[in-house]
């Protein structure tokens, strides 16, 4: 009996560990034209930037933020950041092709628009707090 309970605990521990290693799954349904980008995002980006790209309780910043809108951070800059990385982000050039990066950027831009972000949103929020 003791041996059986030890095996059950061991199996349960392994299953919990394995499920925690899986990339976060999409949390929202997106139009078909953005689904491919969402899939690539969840395979490569979501572990750090969060399943919903908000970055809450993750190692990396949220991308659904006015700082990363195209007016502040162009598609070319985002592409370069993804491919080349930075001191805070590993390069993803070995994980993604150019078309895959383009799909991810398209998905991020869609997600930003869906969140109704506008440039300067943070500043207006600060003014309201004062």
Residue ranges with predicted function:
Residues 1-9:
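Bacterial N-terminal signal peptides that target proteins for export
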Residues 22, 48-54, 83, 109-110:
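Detector for the c-type heme attachment site
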Residues 17-20:
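C-terminal motif of bacterial Sec signal peptides marking the signal peptidase cleavage site
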Residues 24-27, 31, 42, 90-130:
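Flexible coil segments in periplasmic/lumen-exposed cytochrome c-class electron-transfer proteins
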Residues 52, 67, 86, 111-115:
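A general structural signal marking secondary-structure boundaries and capping sites
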Residues 10-15:
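Classic N-terminal secretory signal peptides
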Residues 39-50, 61-62, 80, 87-91, ...:
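C-type cytochrome heme c attachment motif
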Residues 32-38, 50, 54-80:
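Gly/Gly-Pro-rich "capping" loops immediately C-terminal to redox-active cysteine motifs
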